[in-house]
């Protein structure tokens, strides 16, 4: 069967997009779709066994405990966007190597240096593909030199040197975006030409999955969706409005049914 393109008006296109947004709520997708969940970020603290800087009598355990409180507050502030896991205190390159191997499929890595001399502890993290953020308080050490070099050499890494926890807020949103891009799936409706170099480059950079169904493929899936379920969802949507001026109930139902259909072809 040859693909047939059916043109949409600007209003029809907008309604279709609106149906997708509404569908994520009306069909309970917020909690079930992998791209809608929070980012998982593993945190690790670095400190040499015998500190000399920022001072030789530094209580490393106390410093870590205070920062754990700060990071817990940060996580609560961004509940639903980021989950901070891990929290190991690494003293040796061997411990750092073991922690690096435990990162697995985490969306990001948060490194906190507590002392100077942590260069050897950083090396196991240098070649990881996991996006990395260094949280370095002023004068805590010189890890920022290593991480800056990583970024200059193309690693997905950044650093923030600050004593203000609020300066980490933008990075929590970035981690959430990284998670979303890694887990989401994009449908490009075309004439069956398949992947292109732009999509392949985007996948390499962000991990996003692309599907390239033809119009007839999408139409077939659309028609297989439960029209009654879409009609029920449309009624729920309409009841939540003060007044539905436009679109018609048929249009709302069709938009929500289209949303349902987009969940199938990329699985």
For each feature predicted by the language model, list its residue ranges:
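N-terminal export signals
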Residues: 2-30
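Fold-independent oxyanion-binding glycine-rich loops
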Residues: 17, 113, 138, 189-191
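Metallocofactor- and cofactor-centric catalytic cores in central/energy metabolism, strongly enriched
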Residues: 31-119, 123-144, 175, 204, ...
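Flexible, glycine/proline-enriched loop segments at strand-loop-helix junctions
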Residues: 56-57, 157-162, 184-193, 245-250
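Short, glycine-/small-residue-rich phosphate/pyrophosphate-handling segment
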Residues: 139-178, 182
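Short acidic/polar capping segments at secondary-structure boundaries
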Residues: 139-140, 163-167, 191-195, 215-219
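Short, aromatic/basic amphipathic alpha-helical patches
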Residues: 144-152, 197-206
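Conserved anion/nucleotide-ligand pocket segment
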Residues: 176-205
């Amino acid at each position: 069967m040859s693909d047939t393109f059916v043109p949409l008006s600007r209003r029809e296109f907008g309604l279709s997009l609106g149906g997708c947004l509404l569908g994520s709520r009306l069909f309970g997708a917020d909690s079930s779709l992998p791209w809608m969940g929070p980012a998982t970020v593993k945190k690790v603290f670095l400190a040499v066994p015998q500190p000399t800087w920022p001072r030789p009598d530094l209580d490393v355990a106390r410093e870590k405990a205070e920062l754990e409180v700060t990071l817990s507050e940060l996580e609560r502030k961004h509940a639903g966007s980021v989950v901070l896991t891990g929290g190991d205190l690494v003293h040796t390159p061997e411990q750092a190597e073991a922690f690096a191997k435990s990162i697995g499929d985490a969306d990001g890595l948060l490194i906190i240096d507590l002392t100077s001399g942590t260069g050897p502890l950083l090396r196991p993290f240098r070649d990881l593909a996991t996006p990395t953020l260094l949280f370095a308080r002023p004068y805590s050490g010189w890890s920022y030199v290593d991480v800056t070099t990583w970024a200059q050499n193309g690693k997905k890494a950044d650093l923030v040197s600050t004593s203000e926890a609020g300066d980490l807020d933008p990075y929590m949103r970035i981690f959430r975006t990284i998670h979303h891009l890694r887990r989401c799936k994009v449908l490009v409706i075309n004439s069956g030409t398949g992947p292109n170099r732009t999509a392949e480059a985007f996948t390499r950079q962000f991990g996003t999955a692309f599907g390239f169904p033809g119009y007839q493929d999408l139409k077939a899936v659309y028609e297989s969706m439960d029209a009654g379920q879409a009609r029920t969802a449309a009624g729920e949507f309409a009841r939540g409005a003060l007044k539905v001026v436009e679109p018609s109930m048929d249009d709302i139902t069709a938009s929500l049914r289209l949303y349902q259909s987009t969940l199938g072809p990329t699985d």
